[in-house]
């Protein structure tokens, strides 16, 4: 049978167009409502598997981070403090991108990076830390906490020493470059029996310590005493000197024994080489500053540090506790404060 298909009538075409238009508008409104609802929800932070595993929790709420302030030594202290306090308080820890850019090229750190776009949407509770552990830090309130200050004290994280050492494990190529240099060193034609890393902090501290903090930096006498301490206890030691004031070191460190090597490049903007050299030694001589403290902490062995380098009324002692900075087993040699007493 032949069926003839007639065109829609004019009213029927309008009716179908009307239904289609209404349906489209309805679905678009539904979609927009869902999107708006998503934006109005509180920020949901995914808990990364690596973070949960590292912090010993299968499910953690909220997010903790820390300000990335200062150079390498400061940021190592901030990272380790965040790692320890977040774990202590049962919170997931995330580091700022700036901190990741400083530490990741040198160390095998594991804490995830905080996306800057996400960070800007989080209602942070800023929580200031002293440079030493306080009992109240075991119970810091808040799910979204940003730690502030310049924490760099073993009192925060020494109970997790093994984990901290793992976090600050050098990348293979960084470690191998340092070891290759050390393997080529000799003392009076023979291979050294002991490697002692020496870090001499100069730079801004030369002026800041006496003018601002009523303190001193290491002088020639201190370094001579520190080197002699190791010479008296170890056979054929070699002293690997790094500094941001290498010219001063060459003029003030006694090289007559043939056991001193000026090895570092002193470039503060790229400290990996100097730091790696120090940590691949057996022992440490440090002066002041977090760079030397961390080199000694990672190295282990014997450590000599500059002690009592401020006057008793120094404002520095209000923000810095020597007993919280230097491990009890380290050996301090008192600084010569006489230059301060002349003024």
Curated annotation (Swiss-Prot):
Q: Which reaction does it catalyse?
A: a beta-D-galactosyl-(1->3)-N-acetyl-beta-D-glucosaminyl derivative + GDP-beta-L-fucose = an alpha-L-Fuc-(1->2)-beta-D-Gal-(1->3)-beta-D-GlcNAc derivative + GDP + H(+); a beta-D-galactosyl-(1->4)-N-acetyl-beta-D-glucosaminyl derivative + GDP-beta-L-fucose = an alpha-L-Fuc-(1->2)-beta-D-Gal-(1->4)-beta-D-GlcNAc derivative + GDP + H(+); a neolactoside nLc4Cer + GDP-beta-L-fucose = a neolactoside IV(2)-alpha-Fuc-nLc4Cer + GDP + H(+); a neolactoside nLc4Cer(d18:1(4E)) + GDP-beta-L-fucose = a neolactoside IV(2)-alpha-Fuc-nLc4Cer(d18:1(4E)) + GDP + H(+)
- Tell me where in or outside the cell this protein is found: Golgi apparatus, Golgi stack membrane
> Biological process (GO) annotations?
carbohydrate metabolic process; fucosylation; glycolipid metabolic process; protein glycosylation; regulation of cell adhesion; regulation of endothelial cell proliferation
For this record, the Gene Ontology CC terms, alphabetical, are: Golgi cisterna membrane
Spans through the membrane = 15-28
* Glycan-carrying positions: 188, 282, 308
- Name of the protein: Galactoside alpha-(1,2)-fucosyltransferase 2
């Amino acid at each position: 049978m032949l069926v003839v298909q007639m065109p829609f009538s004019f009213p029927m075409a309008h009716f179908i167009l009307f239904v289609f238009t209404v349906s489209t508008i309805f679905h678009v409104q539904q979609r927009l409502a869902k999107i708006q609802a998503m934006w109005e929800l509180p920020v949901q932070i995914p808990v990364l598997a690596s973070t949960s595993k590292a912090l010993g929790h299968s499910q953690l709420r909220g997010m903790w981070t820390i300000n990335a302030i200062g150079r390498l030594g400061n940021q190592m202290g901030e990272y380790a403090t965040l790692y320890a306090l977040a774990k202590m308080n049962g919170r997931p820890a995330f580091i700022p991108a700036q901190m990741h850019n400083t530490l990741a090229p040198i160390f095998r750190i594991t804490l995830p990076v905080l996306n800057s776009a996400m960070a800007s949407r989080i209602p942070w509770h800023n929580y200031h830390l002293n440079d030493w552990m306080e009992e109240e830090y075991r119970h810091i309130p808040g799910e979204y906490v940003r730690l502030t200050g310049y924490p760099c004290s073993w009192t925060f994280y020494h109970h997790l020493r093994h984990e901290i050492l793992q976090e600050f494990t050098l990348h293979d190529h960084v470690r191998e470059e340092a070891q290759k240099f050390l393997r080529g060193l000799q003392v009076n034609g023979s291979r050294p029996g002991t490697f002692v890393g020496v870090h001499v902090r100069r730079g801004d501290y030369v002026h800041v310590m006496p003018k601002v903090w009523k303190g001193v930096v290491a002088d020639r006498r201190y370094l001579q005493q520190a080197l002699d301490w190791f010479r008296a206890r170890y056979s054929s030691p070699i002293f690997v000197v790094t500094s941001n004031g290498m010219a001063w070191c060459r003029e003030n460190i006694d090289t007559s024994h043939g056991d001193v090597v000026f090895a570092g490049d002193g470039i503060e903007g790229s400290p990996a080489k100097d730091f790696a050299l120090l940590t691949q030694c057996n022992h440490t001589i440090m002066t002041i500053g977090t760079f030397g403290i961390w080199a000694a902490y990672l190295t282990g062995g014997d450590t000599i540090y500059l002690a009592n380098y401020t006057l008793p009324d120094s404002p520095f002692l209000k923000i810095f506790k020597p007993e919280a900075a230097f491990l009890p087993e380290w050996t301090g040699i008192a600084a010569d404060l006489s230059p301060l007493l002349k003024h």
